[in-house]
C-alpha cells in the first residue's frame, strides 16, 4: 500500500501541475507552458522553480521560456521544502539580542522567530498534516488537515445545502448536520473528533467539519451533485472587512495557505464561508485580484443545492491560536520575516503597484490623518509646516477615506513613502507595503505598545514611536462609552521640536539604508 504521506504529496503535486501552469503543448515551436500564468515577482521565480521541478525541466528544453536565467539558481528555496538547505532560504531573521524567555543564544532566537513567523511556520503546518479520510481507489474523496483543523484539503467533497439554517450569526456551529458534508473515503472519525480543542469561529474549521461523513456513494461519479465545481475552491471565514488590520489577517493567511498547497494560481474560486443571510462589507476588495480572477462567492449562492467540489481548500484562519498575525506570540528583539516580505512583494506585483522613479533627491514623508472622532492630531498644521521647512523632505498629508481615495491609489502612495507617519490605528497596517528601507512612525501608540511594533518587525522595516511623555498633550483623559477613561478615545497635540527631531532620526535611517535608491550620507542630509 502506498504510504499516506506519499498519497497526500502526490495529490498536492497534481493540484499544482494541473492548475498552476496549464497543460503542455509540445509541438517544437510553441511554448511548452503558459508561463504568464505563474505571474510572480521576478525575484520569486527561482523559489517557485525549486518547488516545481517539472516546470524547470520544461523551461530548460523550451527555447521560449522567459525564466532561463533563473535555472542557475534552483537551489534557492523558501525554507519549508525538504530539499532546502538553510543557506539558500528566501531570508533569515535578524536578532539583536537574546530573549531569554524563549531562547539561550542569538542563533536559537533566530530559529524561534523563523518557526513562529517565517517560512518555518509553513514547514510546521505541512509536517503536522494528517489524512483523516483516506481514499481507497481512483476517484475517491480525501480529507487531510493540520492539527486542530486550522487548514484542510479535500477532494471530491460533497456539500448538501438543500436545508440551509441561516440566520444573523456569521458562524453558526450546527449549520451542517451528519450526512450534509463528506465524501467516499475511509474516515477515521475518532481522529477527526479529537481535533476540536481549539474550536472557535476564526480559529478552526472544526465546527464545519465535525459532521464530515463517509458515504457509500461516490458523490460525483454516482450523480449525487446538482452542481459540480471543477476549479479549485478556497473556503475562507473572514474577519472584519472594514478594518485593514483585521482583514489583512485574512489575506496573509490566504497567502500562507497558497504556500502550504504549492499553488499561486489565480484560476481559483474563493468562497466566503458564512452562515449569515447578510452580505459582507469589504473596503479592501481590490486586494482579491492578487489571488483570484473571479468575484468572491458567498456560500449562500449554493443554498438549496447539493454541491460537489473536485478540489477544496479550507484556508488558514485570521485569529488562530499561535497564528499570523493577530495572535502571534512573537519573540522579542528579532525582526525580518521573509514570509511577510514575500507577501508584500506578491501583492504589490499582482496589483501592479510600483516604485515611482525619483525626480529629486528628497525623502518622501507621508502623514496619514484620521477623519474619525478620536486620535486626531490637533496641531497638524504646525507639524507639517515644520517638516516643509526642511529642504530634503517632500511632505504629503493623506486621509485614506475609501470613498475619496481608492485602495490601489492608497497602496501606491504608501509604497512610494520613505517615512510613513500616523496615529495608532488600523491604517498603520499599510506598513506592510512600505519599501524595505522605509520607517513607520507610530506618532503615539495610545499605550498599545506591541501591535504595530510587532507588525513592523514581521515586515522587517524600522519602527519608531513617540518617546517623551512630557512632550505629548492629550486633549483630555479619553472617554470610551463603556470603559470610561481610555487613551485611544481622545485627540493629541505634539511638541514641534521633538516631532522634528524624531522625523530627522528616521530620515537618517532611510538615508543610510543600503536599498534606498538615493542613498546619501548623514552630512548631505
From Swiss-Prot:
What is the recorded name of this protein? EGF domain-specific O-linked N-acetylglucosamine transferase
**Keywords assigned by UniProt?**
Endoplasmic reticulum, Glycoprotein, Glycosyltransferase, Signal, Transferase
Which Enzyme Commission number(s) are on file for it? Answer: 2.4.1.255
Top EC class, one word: transferase
Any GO BP annotation: protein O-linked glycosylation
Leader peptide range in chain numbering: 1-24
**What is the annotated localization of this protein?**
Endoplasmic reticulum lumen
Record-linked PANTHER family: EGF DOMAIN-SPECIFIC O-LINKED N-ACETYLGLUCOSAMINE TRANSFERASE, GLYCOSYLTRANSFERASE
- State the organism of origin: Xenopus laevis
- Which InterPro entries does the entry mention? Glyco_transf_61_cat, Glycosyltransferase_61
Question: Where are glycans found on this sequence?
Answer: 352
- Catalyzed reactions per annotation: L-seryl-[protein] + UDP-N-acetyl-alpha-D-glucosamine = 3-O-(N-acetyl-beta-D-glucosaminyl)-L-seryl-[protein] + UDP + H(+); L-threonyl-[protein] + UDP-N-acetyl-alpha-D-glucosamine = 3-O-(N-acetyl-beta-D-glucosaminyl)-L-threonyl-[protein] + UDP + H(+)
Motif range for Required for optimal activity?
293-295
| A cellular component annotation (GO) from this entry | endoplasmic reticulum lumen
Domain of life, source organism: Eukaryota
Metal-binding in keyword set: no
Q: In chain numbering, where does the motif Prevents secretion from ER fall?
A: 522-525
The Swiss-Prot or TrEMBL record describes its family as follows: Belongs to the glycosyltransferase 61 family.
Which Gene Ontology terms cover its molecular function?
Answer: protein O-acetylglucosaminyltransferase activity
Main localization category: endoplasmic reticulum
What is the role of the protein in this entry?
A: Catalyzes the transfer of a single N-acetylglucosamine from UDP-GlcNAc to a serine or threonine residue in extracellular proteins resulting in their modification with a beta-linked N-acetylglucosamine (O-GlcNAc). Specifically glycosylates the Thr residue located between the fifth and sixth conserved cysteines of folded EGF-like domains.
Amino acid at each position: 500500500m502506498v504510504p499516506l504521506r506519499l498519497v497526500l504529496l502526490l495529490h498536492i503535486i497534481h493540484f499544482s501541475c494541473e492548475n498552476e501552469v496549464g497543460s503542455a503543448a509540445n509541438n517544437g515551436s510553441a511554448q511548452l507552458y503558459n508561463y504568464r500564468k505563474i505571474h510572480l515577482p521576478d525575484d520569486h521565480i527561482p523559489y517557485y522553480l525549486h518547488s516545481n521541478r517539472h516546470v524547470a525541466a520544461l523551461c530548460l528544453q523550451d527555447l521560449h521560456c522567459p525564466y532561463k536565467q533563473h535555472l542557475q539558481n534552483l537551489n534557492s528555496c523558501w525554507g519549508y521544502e525538504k530539499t532546502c538547505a538553510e543557506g539558500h532560504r528566501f531570508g533569515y531573521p535578524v536578532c539583536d539580542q537574546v530573549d531569554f524567555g524563549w531562547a539561550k543564544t542569538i542563533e536559537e532566537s533566530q530559529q524561534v522567530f523563523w518557526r513562529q513567523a517565517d517560512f518555518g511556520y509553513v514547514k510546521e503546518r505541512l509536517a503536522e498534516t494528517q489524512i483523516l479520510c483516506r481514499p481507497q481507489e481512483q476517484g475517491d474523496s480525501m480529507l487531510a488537515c493540520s492539527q486542530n483543523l486550522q487548514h484542510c484539503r479535500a477532494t471530491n467533497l460533497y456539500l448538501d445545502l438543500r436545508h440551509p439554517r441561516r440566520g444573523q450569526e456569521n458562524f453558526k456551529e450546527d449549520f451542517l448536520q451528519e450526512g450534509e458534508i463528506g465524501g467516499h473515503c475511509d474516515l477515521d472519525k475518532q481522529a477527526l473528533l479529537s481535533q476540536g480543542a481549539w474550536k472557535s469561529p476564526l480559529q478552526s474549521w472544526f465546527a464545519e467539519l465535525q459532521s464530515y461523513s463517509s458515504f457509500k456513494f461516490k458523490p460525483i461519479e454516482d450523480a449525487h451533485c446538482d452542481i459540480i465545481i471543477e476549479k479549485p475552491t478556497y473556503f475562507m471565514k473572514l474577519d472584519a472587512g472594514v478594518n485593514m488590520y483585521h482583514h489583512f489577517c485574512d489575506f496573509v493567511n490566504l497567502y500562507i495557505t497558497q504556500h502550504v498547497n504549492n499553488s499561486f494560481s489565480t484560476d481559483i474560486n474563493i468562497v466566503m464561508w458564512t452562515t449569515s443571510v447578510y452580505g459582507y462589507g469589504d473596503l479592501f476588495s481590490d486586494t482579491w485580484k492578487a489571488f483570484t480572477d473571479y468575484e468572491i462567492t458567498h456560500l449562500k449562492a449554493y443554498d438549496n443545492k447539493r454541491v460537489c467540489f473536485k478540489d477544496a481548500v479550507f484556508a488558514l484562519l485570521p485569529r488562530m491560536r499561535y497564528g499570523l498575525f493577530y495572535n502571534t506570540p512573537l519573540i522579542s528583539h528579532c525582526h525580518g520575516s521573509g514570509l511577510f516580505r514575500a507577501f508584500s512583494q506578491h501583492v504589490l506585483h499582482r496589483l501592479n503597484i510600483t516604485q515611482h522613479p525619483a525626480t529629486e533627491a528628497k525623502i518622501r514623508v507621508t502623514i496619514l490623518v484620521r477623519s474619525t472622532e478620536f486620535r486626531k492630531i490637533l496641531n497638524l498644521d504646525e507639524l507639517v509646516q515644520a517638516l516643509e521647512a526642511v529642504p530634503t523632505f517632500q511632505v504629503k498629508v493623506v486621509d485614506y477615506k475609501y470613498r475619496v481615495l481608492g485602495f490601489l491609489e492608497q497602496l501606491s502612495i504608501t509604497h512610494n513613502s520613505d517615512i510613513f507617519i500616523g496615529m495608532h490605528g488600523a491604517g498603520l497596517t499599510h506598513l506592510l507595503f512600505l519599501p524595505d528601507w522605509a520607517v513607520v512612525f507610530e506618532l503615539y501608540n495610545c499605550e498599545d505598545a506591541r501591535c504595530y511594533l510587532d507588525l513592523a518587525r514581521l515586515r522587517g522595516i524600522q519602527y519608531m514611536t513617540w518617546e517623551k511623555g512630557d512632550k505629548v498633550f492629550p486633549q483630555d483623559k479619553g472617554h470610551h462609552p463603556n470603559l470610561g477613561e481610555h487613551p485611544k478615545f481622545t485627540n493629541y497635540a505634539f511638541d514641534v521640536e521633538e516631532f522634528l527631531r524624531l522625523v530627522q532620526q528616521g530620515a537618517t535611517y532611510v538615508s543610510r539604508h543600503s536599498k534606498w535608491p538615493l542613498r546619501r550620507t548623514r552630512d548631505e542630509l
